[in-house]
Amino acid sequence: MNNDTSKKLGTLVSDDGPVNVYVWDMDETLILLRSLLNGTYAESFNGSKDVKRGVEIGRMWEKHILKICDDFFFYEQVEECNEPFLDSLRQYDDGKDLSRYEFKQDDFSTPTDDLNKRKLAYRHRAVAERYEKGLCPFIDSESMSGLDELYNVTDEYTDRWLSSARAFLEQCSCVEESSDGTSAIEQSSQDIHILVTSGALIPSLVKCLLFRLDTFLRHENVYSSIDVGKLQCFKWIKERFNHPKFRFCAIGDGWEECAAAQALQWPFVKIDLQPDSSHRFPGLTPKTVSYYFAAVYGNSDADSSKE
């Protein structure tokens, strides 16, 4: 662990107790998309949900995700160049000012050499900067209203799955409202949220923006396991937060994150789509997850204070 990493960890660790690191899956965990598209979400309700309506909602999300990926996040150029996280090529980035850089005219191609790796690193830096600014600089008010409406329609159709998942993240984070109505995480927050998705990196970042998760998931905490596997991503996360006070818990619906968590002896919370399950949204709470932490790491004052 280098000095910079040690300093960053020092700002996250206090004398108040352990720091919980929540390692999330995305689809069918923090959001619903795949199960809308293939109908499995609606089918789990045994006829009380309109399957076709769910598919329509999922297709609308797909359309918006791909458009924003292509229009603002270079996805047409980098689709075949997926990396596990945005900083993976930082060593090739020379820090060039990108404010007037012509991304469409730099002859970027598959990064098999240092020059194209640098060009890809430029794109990753630009993506990170755009992600941190949110959608407002790129989307007009009419389009934003349409996205808000789609979010609300989806939340209603899914019985508040989206807003309940977001509320979970908010309860585990110190969130401050700014004068312009936006939210920001206080640096003193004792919990960390990390996303490890089996989807491609750029679309996953765009999903975070569209599903209002970017307040809680910074770009450096979003990983794509599609090429390297979830176990490797989990190992990187464990290495990043290499301090006795950090406690890890994986939350997802798939076998791969379960196996990866077991390999590292982390607690794992299995998300279940079934309507009568408590391990879904709404239903899952920080209090419930605190029992999983306690089972592996023992009780703490922080656990007993969860509501």
UniProtKB/Swiss-Prot annotation:
Keywords: Hydrolase, Magnesium, Metal-binding, Protein phosphatase. Its cofactor is Mg(2+). Residues 1-15 are annotated as: Necessary for optimum phosphatase activity. It comes from the Eukaryota. Mg(2+) binds at residues 25, 27, 253. The keyword Zinc does not apply. Optimum pH is 5.5. One of its GO terms (biological process) is protein dephosphorylation. Inhibited by EDTA. Its EC number is 3.1.3.48. It is an enzyme of class 3 (hydrolase). Coiled coil: none annotated. It catalyses: O-phospho-L-tyrosyl-[protein] + H2O = L-tyrosyl-[protein] + phosphate. Gene3D superfamilies: 3.40.50.12350. Possesses phosphatase activity in presence of Mn(2+), Co(2+), Ni(2+) or Zn(2+). No phosphatase activity in presence Ca(2+). Signal peptide: none annotated. GO terms for molecular function: metal ion binding; protein tyrosine phosphatase activity, metal-dependent. InterPro entries: EYA, EYA_dom, EYA_dom_sf, HAD-like_sf. The active site is at 25 (nucleophile), 27 (proton donor). Belongs to the HAD-like hydrolase superfamily. EYA family. Possesses phosphatase activity toward para-nitrophenyl phosphate (pNPP) in vitro. Possesses phosphatase activity toward several phosphotyrosine-containing peptides in vitro, with low peptide substrate specificity. This is Protein phosphatase EYA. The lineage of its organism: Eukaryota, Viridiplantae, Streptophyta, Embryophyta, Tracheophyta. The gene is EYA.
